[in-house]
């Protein structure tokens, strides 16, 4: 099962993430958990989130990039849900053998995320990749949708279909 942990503080403003979720939602065995819908008060139900993670074989962290990082509720979710003794540390093997895909949208162009005057995309992904590996997850190459503020609807839809194809390819390769 694919579990999408979706974290967008302003979901009604995001055409890109909306298209991505619509495409992913057409696949079988996909569960979408919208953190800002479930926890507008930031009071996360840790047990429910851990149960959802336990059912998954592929976990997707989908969100817009905010200040070169994740939105605040996703960071809090990581702090609470990926608990010592459950996700890492002594006895913390609940996520071992599962895969993680980082699916991120950005307002900047792909060339904005190259080494030079801006941090490289590989550099920006390091904290998430380190978190995944620390929890025993297999890190997959990220899916990034760039220039989302200026893309026309056809371009957004095409990129969202590419996202769906990434998920479908993973399902077919992993019988999940």
From Swiss-Prot:
Positions that bind FMN: 8, 14-17, 65-68, 105-108
Top EC class, one word: oxidoreductase
InterPro entries: Flavodoxin_fold, Flavoprotein-like_sf, K_H_efflux_KefF, KefG/KefF
GO BP annotations listed: positive regulation of potassium ion transmembrane transport; potassium ion transport
Example of a GO MF term: NADH:ubiquinone reductase (non-electrogenic) activity
Keyword set, alphabetical order: Cell inner membrane, Cell membrane, Flavoprotein, FMN, Membrane, NAD, Oxidoreductase
Reaction catalysed by this enzyme: a quinone + NADH + H(+) = a quinol + NAD(+); a quinone + NADPH + H(+) = a quinol + NADP(+)
One Pfam family from the record: Flavodoxin_2
Location(s), subcellular: Cell inner membrane
Enzyme Commission (EC) number: 1.6.5.2
Family: Belongs to the NAD(P)H dehydrogenase (quinone) family. KefF subfamily.
Known role: Regulatory subunit of a potassium efflux system that confers protection against electrophiles. Required for full activity of KefC. Shows redox enzymatic activity, but this enzymatic activity is not required for activation of KefC.
Name of protein: Glutathione-regulated potassium-efflux system ancillary protein KefF
């Amino acid at each position: 099962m694919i579990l999408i942990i979706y974290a967008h503080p302003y979901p009604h403003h995001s055409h890109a993430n909306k298209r991505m979720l619509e495409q992913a939602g057409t696949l079988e065995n996909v569960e979408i958990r919208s953190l800002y819908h479930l926890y507008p008060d930031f009071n996360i139900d840790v047990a429910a989130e851990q149960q959802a993670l336990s059912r998954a074989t592929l976990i997707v962290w989908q969100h817009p990039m905010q200040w070169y990082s994740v939105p605040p509720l996703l960071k809090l979710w990581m702090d609470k849900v990926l608990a010592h003794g459950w996700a890492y540390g002594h006895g913390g093997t609940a996520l071992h053998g599962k895969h993680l895909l980082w699916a991120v949208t950005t307002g900047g162009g792909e060339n904005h995320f190259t080494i030079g005057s801006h941090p490289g995309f590989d550099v920006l992904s390091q904290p998430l990749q380190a978190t995944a590996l620390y929890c025993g997850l297999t890190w997959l190459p990220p899916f990034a949708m760039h220039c989302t503020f200026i893309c026309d609807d056809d371009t957004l839809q095409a990129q969202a279909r590419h996202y769906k194809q990434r998920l479908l390819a993973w399902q077919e390769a992993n019988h999940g």
